[in-house]
Regions:
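ATP-binding N-terminal substructure of ATP-dependent carboxylate-amine bond-forming enzymes
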Residues: 1-110, 136
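Structural detector of well-ordered beta-strand residues that form the stable sheet scaffold
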Residues: 40, 79, 99-101, 127, ...
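CheY-like receiver
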Residues: 70-71, 118, 141-144, 175-178
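Short glycine-rich anion-binding loops that position phosphate/pyrophosphate groups of nucleotides
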Residues: 83-85, 155-156, 201
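A conserved helix-loop-beta module that forms one wall/lid of the active-site cleft
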Residues: 96, 102-164
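Internal nucleotide-binding/catalytic subdomain
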Residues: 162, 166-262
């Protein structure tokens, strides 16, 4: 039986498992090492920068359940550098070790419409948006947003991938096909002035806190620079922190959560 409320202290037995071997996995491993933890990386074979800085590596696919079981038995907990881990993989790992954050959180982060619904439930505002299942939905929703929107696949996609800007000259049928004719969300395009990020952590013993709020600067939809702490008045800071804690409660969340606000 896994006791998910016990703190995981740095020692030879308490190895942190990391899912994904990219740059974020590397940063997790480096941070863990500074705190005295050993790390065990699980990722498909390939060009994985995180492999250079961990104590142990298992190369396997996300559906290689034999390797996943062996990996889970070697670690005190497992976390991930990205959200798109298959649910069956997470369910298997959760049966043998403490997966942080939980499968519920991963599922919410994997589906944009669920993310938006959770944000609204927690008190955050979102741009107007519509769930798009076919071209009829797309035509109707685009008209509602005055042909000024962004169409995104409901799952996957990042750094500007898996999305298209919609305007008066857009060929909606062509764009729909380019995105694979899969379920999408259509978001109102906002003319925003600033982007602020808030990062909140909460441990299984309910110790929590915030990193300094930061301001992000992008070029062509890709992050170029972050400045911390961001210059914000205390009223806005307190409001953001309150809503972030509410989001954490709604997700029964443990770990570190980051939210981008515009």
């Amino acid at each position: 039986m896994i006791n998910k409320n016990l703190p995981i202290l740095p020692n030879e037995k308490n190895v942190i498992g990391i899912l994904g071997g990219g740059q974020l996995g590397k940063l997790i491993a480096l941070s863990a090492s500074k705190s005295g933890y050993k790390t065990h990386l699980y990722c498909p074979r390939g060009d994985n920068p995180a492999e250079m800085v961990v104590d142990k590596v298992t190369n396997g696919e996300w559906n290689d359940f034999e390797k996943l079981v062996q990996f889970s038995e070697d670690v005190a907990c497992a976390t991930s550098e990205f959200e798109n881990i298959p649910s069956k993989t997470l369910e298997l790992l959760s049966g043998n070790t403490n997966v942080i954050p939980s499968n519920i959180v991963f599922r919410c982060a994997q589906i944009r419409s669920k993310e938006k619904e959770m944000a609204l439930k927690s008190g955050f505002n979102t741009p107007k948006w519509f769930l798009i299942k076919n071209t009829d939905d797309l035509i109707t929703a685009t008209q509602s947003l005055s042909n000024n929107a962004i169409l995104k696949t409901n799952t996957f996609g990042y750094d500007g991938k898996g999305q298209f800007r919609i305007n008066n000259n857009s060929n909606l049928f062509e764009i729909w096909e380019k995105l694979g004719a899969v379920e999408c969300v259509l978001e109102e395009l906002l003319d925003f002035k600033r982007e602020i990020s808030i990062m909140y952590f909460k441990s299984t013993d309910n110790t929590d806190g915030f990193f300094p709020l930061s301001e992000n600067f992008h070029e062509n939809g890709i992050l170029k620079k972050t400045i911390a702490p961001a210059i914000l008045n205390d009223v806005i800071k307190d409001e953001l922190k309150l809503k972030t804690k509410k989001l954490s409660e709604n997700l029964n969340f443990y770990g570190i959560i980051a939210i981008e606000l515009f």
